[in-house]
Structures are given as C-alpha cells and as structure tokens.
C-alpha cells in the first residue's frame, strides 16, 4: 500500500512551515517549534495522518469513486494535473470558479459547450466558418478547456477532494463541506484546518513536497482501483493455481 516515510518527508522539506508571524493558532497542535522565525511542522504527527489519508483514498479508489485534485497556484498546478491523469482522476489546476461544485448544473452546461466546440473542431465545422468566427470559437474553446478541461469527463460530483494549500483553495473546501464531500488537504502553518476532514500538516509551497503528496495520493487511488479489479478477477475464477 502507498505510504510515505519520515525520511521521504524530510528530504522533500515537508517540515518547513511559514514565517512565525503568519501562523494560524489553530495549527498549534501540529507545530514542533520554530527555527530562524520559521515554524517547523511536527512530522511525527504528519506521517501517521498522511498515511491514514492515503489508506482512505485507496478505499475511495476501490469503490470506483471519483477524486478531484485541486491546486491552482503555480507551485502545484502542473503536478496536480499529472497526478490526476496518472490515476485516471480529475483536476482543477488553473482557477477555481465559484460554484464549480455547488452550482454543478451550470458547470455541466459549460462542459457541454466545450465538448460541442471540440466536436466542431474535429469534424471540420470550424473550417466552414469565417476566419473571425472560427477564431472566436477557438478562443472560447481554449478558455473553457483551461477552466474545465480537468473535469469535463467527471460526469457528476466527485466523491473526494484532494487539495494542495487549504488556505488558497478555501472556496473549493467550503463548497465540498456544503455538499458533504470529504476533503483531504495539505494544511500549512498559516492555514485554517477547519473544514478539512483529513488534515495533512505540511509545507504547501516547496515543489518537491507538493509532488510527494500528489504522487502518493495518485498511487493510493490507483492501488485501490486495481485492488477492486483483482477481487473481481478472483470471483470470476481468473486466479491461476499455484
């Protein structure tokens, strides 16, 4: 099963929080101390909390649940997309549009528009338009792809959110809370852990740390999905005799 060790976390700089003056007192239970006016996160708390989160994510995968990876700041954006694609899941890595979850009906209409444009671009419809009209549609398609490309095949609300930077993505977390969707989030020393079901106390800025969280989460979801496949195969008698 996907797990992360303290050594992995130390190497990735998970323990480095924000400057002490920016701290959120609600993160006090997860802080080890301070060095050079920077809070140090207690990895003895983070390691078991993250591994518990990974075990739960694997269960989501096993039930064929949908995980939405969210991280829109520069340090996380590309890694969020890669993790979602690697685990056959979904992502928002550009900008969280208000109502993406709570007003999913409207979002679904925009996704339909995006898919219509994609079909038109493929079947030659764009070529029959005037240059100006084709350019306008192409631009709108690109804009929609940037915002909704990572969720266009989600086909409904997700079963879990995996968030990088609880502070930056507080709107996404609030929407998930309103709908009862479990939230797994990396929470740094400057963030509010309220509303996060599975808190992962850790650095949310260092690219190596961000990649560590995302790679482990993607692996956990994939392992869960594959476990389900193995169980089905066993039931169907595909298991070879020793």
Swiss-Prot record:
NCBIfam families: rpsB_bact (TIGR01011). Pfam families: Ribosomal_S2. This is Small ribosomal subunit protein uS2. One of its GO terms (molecular function) is structural constituent of ribosome. Keywords: Ribonucleoprotein, Ribosomal protein. One of its GO terms (cellular component) is cytosolic small ribosomal subunit. The gene is rpsB. The keyword Nucleotide-binding does not apply. Gene3D superfamilies: Glucose-6-phosphate isomerase like protein, domain 1, Helix hairpin bin. InterPro entries: Ribosomal_uS2, Ribosomal_uS2_bac/mit/plastid, Ribosomal_uS2_CS, Ribosomal_uS2_flav_dom_sf. It comes from the Bacteria.
């Amino acid at each position: 099963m996907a797990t992360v060790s303290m050594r992995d976390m130390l190497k990735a700089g998970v323990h480095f929080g924000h400057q002490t003056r920016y701290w959120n007192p609600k993160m006090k239970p997860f802080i080890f101390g301070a060095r050079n006016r920077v809070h140090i996160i207690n990895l003895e708390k983070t390691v078991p909390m993250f591994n518990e989160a990974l075990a739960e994510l694997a269960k989501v995968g096993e039930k064929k649940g949908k995980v939405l990876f969210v991280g829109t700041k520069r340090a996380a954006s590309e890694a969020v997309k890669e993790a979602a694609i690697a685990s056959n899941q979904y992502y928002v890595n550009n900008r969280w549009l208000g109502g993406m979850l709570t007003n999913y009906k409207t979002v679904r209409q925009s996704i339909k528009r995006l898919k219509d444009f994609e079909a038109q671009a493929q079947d030659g419809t764009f070529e029959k338009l005037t240059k100006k009209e084709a350019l306008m549609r192409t631009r709108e398609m690109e804009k929609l792809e940037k915002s909704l490309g990572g969720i266009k095949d989600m086909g409904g609300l997700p079963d879990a959110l995996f968030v990088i930077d609880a502070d930056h993505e507080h709107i996404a977390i609030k929407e998930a809370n309103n709908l009862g969707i479990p939230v797994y989030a990396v929470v740094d020393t400057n963030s509010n852990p309220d509303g996060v079901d599975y808190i992962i106390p850790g650095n949310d800025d260092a690219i190596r740390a961000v990649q560590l969280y995302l790679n482990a989460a993607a692996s956990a979801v994939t392992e869960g999905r594959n476990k389900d496949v193995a169980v089905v195969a066993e039931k169907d008698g595909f298991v070879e005799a020793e």
